[in-house]
Amino acid sequence: SWTRILHPFIGVIMAVSFLAAFLRFRNLNRMTPADREWLSRAREMVDGNDHNMPEQGKYNGGQKMMFWAMSLCVLLLAVSGIFLWRAYFNMPVGIVRLSAVVHAAIAAFMIGIVMVHVYAAIWTKGTIRAMWYGTVTRAWAKQHHRAWYREVTGK
């Protein structure tokens, strides 16, 4: 079927595109002590007590974890996908079978973390607008990403 033929090529496009995004955003997603503290107190955020959360830059600890998890997943998908691409690569049957399991498990895991990400975005008022339009209000930035707000506004 066409999906079976196109899947590997779309995978290459996805991997190359993600590599470009990774190279662009990796420095903004380095974990800091404030991110670790934010993650340890994430329950407060979920409970709506987000006013006393540690100051965050452009991305919070949860967003940074999402970035690194997706980066690792795309890498594993690319490697396992290459092992599965029998039209161009000749791998032993055992490696192909293991790669199929790894590929499917990583894809399922990625779907799960994307679902959590979407749920978290819905949960945090103003986030859907930020993802849809690429902008946030000053008040939202000041409340959720104070360090970034100060960096951008100088206040």
Segments predicted by a language model, with ranges:
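Membrane-embedded alpha-helical bundles that constitute the cytochrome b-like, heme-associated redox core
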Residues: 1-155
